[in-house]
Curated annotation (Swiss-Prot):
It comes from Mycobacterium tuberculosis (strain ATCC 25618 / H37Rv). The active site is at residues 87, 211, 239. This is Putative non-heme bromoperoxidase BpoC. Substrate binds at residues 21, 87-88, 120, 239. GO terms for cellular component: membrane. Belongs to the AB hydrolase superfamily. Keywords: Oxidoreductase, Peroxidase. GO terms for molecular function: bromide peroxidase activity. InterPro entries: AB_hydrolase (IPR050471), AB_hydrolase_1 (IPR000073), AB_hydrolase_fold (IPR029058), Epox_hydrolase-like (IPR000639). The gene is bpoC.
Length: 262
């Protein structure tokens, strides 16, 4: 394992949060960490390999990132831990429960999938070609694409709400790095749903109704494959639904974790 940059707050039962592609550990700090700390949990967030303050490594795979998360849980001696993941982070959590089930007591998977459908295969291929071409999009166009990919129509049609995101995305455009390019490939390369039928831990899968990156029907497939899977869909939310609808998402996660054994 490389040196992962992580934050560890609180003293209750541990919850490990795994961010999506391009997201640093601080992704969870505006909304989820305060809610979980208030509920008495210990919150561990970290920068995935290739992003943030963690070494900007390259040449890694999904298996490498799964091993990183496993090593963090083992190093902190917090197994079995509750785990929360979104998008790529949810996929990492799923694969972790396949190879090291003893490390995870229960999990919440948001905006996830166990396979790529035809549209998502094409989207990934197109994004890989953009990265590999070396073309850097103008910040405003990059912001436009991120808005359309990540938010619901409700947010996009709200002048106040969308204005804040326009400003943020325009000021902080995505920079192409080897690490971010590797993260793009940290997605299902085959249909992984059959493997998930052996996961015994209780899992809540949360889908976001307006998600075009990982549409909710793909998340429902994961829940259906899990022996102890549950599914919940949040309305008026896109791929970043945990930012758009934090109260609804946090309430669902905390209710779920309270209902299952640590």
């Amino acid at each position: 394992m490389i040196n992962l940059a992580y934050d560890d707050n609180g003293t209750g039962d541990p919850v490990v949060f795994i961010a999506g592609r391009g997201g640093a550990g601080r992704t969870w700090h505006p909304h989820q960490v305060p809610a979980f700390l208030a509920a008495g949990y210990r919150c561990i967030t970290f920068d995935n390999r290739g992003i943030g303050a963690t070494e900007n490594a390259e040449g890694f795979t999904t298996q490498t990132m799964v091993a990183d998360t496993a090593a963090l849980i083992e190093t902190l001696d917090i197994a079995p831990a509750r785990v929360v993941g979104v998008s790529m982070g949810a996929f990492i959590a799923q694969e972790l429960m396949v190879v090291a089930p003893e490390l995870v007591s229960s999990a919440v998977l948001m905006a996830t999938r166990g396979r790529l459908d035809r549209a998502r295969q094409f989207f990934n291929k197109a994004e890989a070609e953009l990265y590999d071409s070396g073309v850097q999009l103008p910040p405003t166009y990059d912001a436009r694409a991120r808005l359309l990919e990540n938010f619901s129509r409700k947010t996009l049609n709200d002048d106040v709400a969308v204005g804040d995101w326009i400003a943020m995305f325009s000021m902080w455009p995505i920079k192409s790095t080897p690490g971010l390019r590797c993260q793009l490939d940290c997605a299902p390369q085959t249909n992984r749903l059959p493997a998930y039928r052996n996961i015994a831990a209780p899992v809540l899968v949360i889908g976001f109704a307006d998600d075009v990156v990982t549409p909710p029907y793909l998340g429902r497939e994961v829940a259906d494959a899990l022996p102890n899977g549950r599914y919940l869909q949040i309305p008026d939310a896109g791929h970043l639904g945990f930012f758009e609808r934090p109260e609804a998402v946090n309430t669902a996660m905390l209710k779920f974790f309270a209902s299952v054994k640590a």
